[in-house]
């Protein structure tokens, strides 16, 4: 994956591929397959959130898919308001259906939106997480700008993805965004019973805005 800008034709082709995967029956198939594979990673996110000892606040899951992680967070932390955003309207519809069944609507909200233009005001969230979504982003600079924009001063940004995502790629993109100068921590992480670390975690802590 590269962080360069892409042409409209290539971008349209990529979006068509994502629509095939994440709309209609594809959203149901995704829920029943990927959720089982990513459950250990979601448990790691819950553990990382618990370490913050948040007393209330708002958490955003970017690329939420069917909203499994959002509901996991809402159940684990009753004092948090949890939001999920995804480009796929079918995924968001599925997430809302599941949330209604689990009676979590009072503290959970799902929105259709693009990581390059998030549907939230500036400085909205205490923590933003994204799991296994970054490798779908066709460029990194604008998504990082948007994540910075909606994060509160003192907020945390955590991006979890496959280990093949290189830190140098993120650092290069960060240099062209308001995140420049903010320290990025990264580490390989193990989850579940996997003997090897198959995921990488990128983390930022915005102590204050420049």
Identify the function of each model-found stretch.
Residues 37-56:
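Conserved alpha-helix/loop element of class I SAM-dependent methyltransferases that forms part
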Residues 116-127:
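A short acidic, Gly/Pro-enriched loop at the edge of an enzyme's catalytic core
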Residues 155-161:
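Conserved beta-strand signature within the Rossmann-like core of class I S-adenosyl-L-methionine
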Residues 103-116:
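Conserved SAM-binding strand-loop segment of SAM-dependent methyltransferases
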């Amino acid at each position: 994956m590269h962080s360069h800008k892409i042409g409209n034709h290539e971008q349209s082709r990529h979006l068509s591929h994502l629509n095939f995967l994440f709309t209609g029956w594809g959203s149901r198939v995704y829920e029943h397959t990927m959720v089982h594979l990513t459950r250990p990673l979601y448990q790691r996110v819950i553990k990382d959130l618990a370490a913050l000892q948040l007393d209330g606040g708002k958490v955003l899951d970017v690329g939420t898919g069917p909203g499994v992680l959002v509901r996991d967070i809402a159940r684990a932390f009753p004092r948090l308001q949890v939001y999920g955003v995804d480009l796929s309207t079918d995924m968001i519809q599925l997430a809302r259906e599941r949330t209604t069944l689990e009676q979590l609507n009072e503290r959970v909200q799902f929105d259709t939106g693009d990581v390059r233009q998030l549907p939230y005001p500036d400085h909205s969230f205490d923590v933003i997480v994204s799991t296994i979504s970054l490798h779908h982003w066709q460029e990194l600079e604008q998504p990082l700008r948007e994540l910075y924009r909606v994060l509160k001063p003192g907020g945390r940004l955590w991006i979890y993805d496959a280990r093949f995502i290189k830190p140098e790629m993120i650092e290069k993109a960060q240099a062209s965004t308001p995140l420049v100068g903010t320290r990025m921590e990264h580490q390989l992480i193990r989850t579940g019973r996997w003997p090897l670390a198959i995921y990488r975690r990128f983390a930022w802590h915005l102590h204050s805005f420049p």
